[in-house]
């Protein structure tokens, strides 16, 4: 029937239902964080983070900052659905992180990084995330 055709088309064309929200935090001296949430309804389906740390402002060497970030986020290493790179670029330390919640296990993420993934259940709520981000000093960028 036509109806089943339409619904299977919709699921392959995710662009209609997903929205992207970008949050930026410059309130921590020496660190600029940009988070991009891909959201379907209230469910976060993907989260990307780009953190740029300026060692000069932080009063440390790029190598020290890099190892601090590696240590702090080592819980992400080896988790399925998670891609992370931490590198020194032009004297700054750049962390890129992508979490695909359709693949990642939220209980694993919680175990690895409890302070980053609070709450219960096996989904990430966008409205809860947004509140938490605003408390941390993030502001949503509107296009």
Across the structure, where does each feature detected by a protein language model lie?
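Short, surface-exposed coil-to-beta transition loops
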Residues: 29-35
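A cross-family detector of function-defining hotspots
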Residues: 23-28, 85
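N-terminal, intrinsically disordered, polar/charged segments of Gram-positive cell-envelope systems
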Residues: 1-20
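Mature, soluble, non-transmembrane domains
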Residues: 75, 79-143
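Short, hydrophobic/aromatic-rich segments at coil-to-beta transitions
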Residues: 14-24, 70-71, 81
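Short, cysteine-centered beta-strand-loop-beta hairpins and adjacent loop/turn segments enriched
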Residues: 28-29, 53-60, 102-110
């Amino acid at each position: 029937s036509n109806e089943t055709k339409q619904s299977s088309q919709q699921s392959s064309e995710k662009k209609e239902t997903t929205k992207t929200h970008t949050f930026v935090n410059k309130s921590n001296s020496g660190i600029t964080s940009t988070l991009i949430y891909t959201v379907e309804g209230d469910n976060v389906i993907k989260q990307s983070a780009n953190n740029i740390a300026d060692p000069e402002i932080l009063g440390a060497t790029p190598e020290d900052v890099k190892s601090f970030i590696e240590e702090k986020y080592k819980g992400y290493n080896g988790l399925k659905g998670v891609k992370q790179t931490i590198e020194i670029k032009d004297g700054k330390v750049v962390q890129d992180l992508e979490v695909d919640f359709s693949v990642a296990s939220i209980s694993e993420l919680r175990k690895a990084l409890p302070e980053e993934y609070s709450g219960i259940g096996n989904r990430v709520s966008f409205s809860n995330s947004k509140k938490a981000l605003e408390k941390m000093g993030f502001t949503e960028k509107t296009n």
